[in-house]
């Protein structure tokens, strides 16, 4: 499977849970910015992997992977011995 764009909205405001339990990455490795996109208030990024955060539960946490972000995340999935299929099943 090959993806060039992935965007998933999680109905939670707990960014740490999404990064560490769903993506299985470490939040301290991400850079935090006090501004966001798409009317989100802040975001975290690791390379081209973006996690946008809103205090509003309706918006929740948004994961956005564009082309290079998908390739980077594939590298992490490979290191975790997971596939895209397994990742989407965990989501």
Regions found by a protein language model. Name each.
Residues 1-91:
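Structured, helix-rich domain cores that form ligand/interaction pockets
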């Amino acid at each position: 499977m090959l993806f060039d764009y992935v965007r998933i909205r999680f109905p939670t405001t707990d960014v740490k849970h999404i990064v560490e339990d769903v993506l299985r990455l470490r939040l301290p490795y991400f850079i935090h910015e006090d501004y966001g996109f798409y009317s989100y208030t802040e975001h975290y990024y690791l390379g081209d992997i973006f996690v946008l955060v809103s205090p509003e539960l309706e918006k929740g946490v948004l994961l956005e992977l564009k082309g290079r972000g998908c390739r980077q995340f594939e590298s992490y999935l490979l290191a975790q011995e997971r596939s895209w299929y397994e990742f989407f099943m965990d989501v």
